[in-house]
Curated annotation (Swiss-Prot):
Disulfide bonds: none annotated. It comes from the Eukaryota. It comes from Drosophila teissieri (Fruit fly). Belongs to the janus family. PANTHER family: BCDNA.GH02250-RELATED, JANUS-A/JANUS-B. JanA and janB regulate somatic sex differentiation. Pfam families: Ocnus (PF05005). This is Sex-regulated protein janus-A. One of its GO terms (biological process) is cell differentiation. One of its GO terms (molecular function) is protein histidine phosphatase activity.
Length: 135
C-alpha cells in the first residue's frame, strides 16, 4: 500500500468515526422541569453531515453557557457546533406541556418550529406550543 492509499484509508476511517459520533448525539437534552433558556445547535461531523439538536438547562444563566458546555462535549467527539439561535422553554411534565418562546440576546431567535419538531421526537405525547412573544 502506498502513502496515498494509506492516507485515503485513514481519512475514510476518521470520517466513519465522526459519522458514528454524530449519530450518537441525542436530539434533545433539557432540564426535567421549569422555565429555562435553551439553544438550538447544529452539530457537524468532519464531512457534510450535520443535525440540529436542542439543549436547555436550568443551571445556566446565559444562552452562551449552554452552548459552551455542549460545544466542549461535541469537540471531545470530534464534532463541531454552531448556534443559530436560542430562546426559552417552559417544561411542565405533570401536564405533559412544553412551551418554546423568546430569543437569545447573544445568538438571536432560534427557529421555534424546528425546535418544536425536535422536542416532539423525545416528547411525542406532550402538547408543545411555540410563541414569538416574550423574552
Amino acid at each position: 500500500m502506498n502513502r496515498l492509499q494509506l492516507f485515503s484509508k485513514g481519512l475514510r476511517l476518521i470520517h466513519k468515526m465522526s459519522e458514528e459520533a454524530l449519530a450518537g448525539v441525542p436530539l434533545v437534552h433539557i432540564s426535567p422541569e421549569g422555565i429555562f433558556k435553551y439553544v438550538l445547535i447544529n452539530v457537524i461531523d468532519g464531512g457534510d453531515a450535520s443535525k440540529a439538536v436542542v439543549r436547555g438547562f436550568d443551571d445556566c444563566t446565559w444562552h452562551a453557557d449552554i452552548f459552551d458546555r455542549e460545544e466542549e462535549v461535541f469537540k471531545k467527539l470530534g464534532l463541531r457546533a454552531e448556534c443559530p439561535g436560542g430562546g426559552r422553554i417552559e417544561h411542565n411534565p405533570e401536564k405533559k406541556y412544553l412551551k418554546v418562546y423568546g430569543y437569545s440576546q447573544g445568538f438571536g431567535k432560534a427557529d421555534h418550529a424546528q425546535t418544536k419538531r425536535i422536542l416532539a421526537t423525545k416528547y411525542p405525547d406532550y402538547t408543545i406550543e411555540t410563541s414569538d412573544e416574550g423574552y
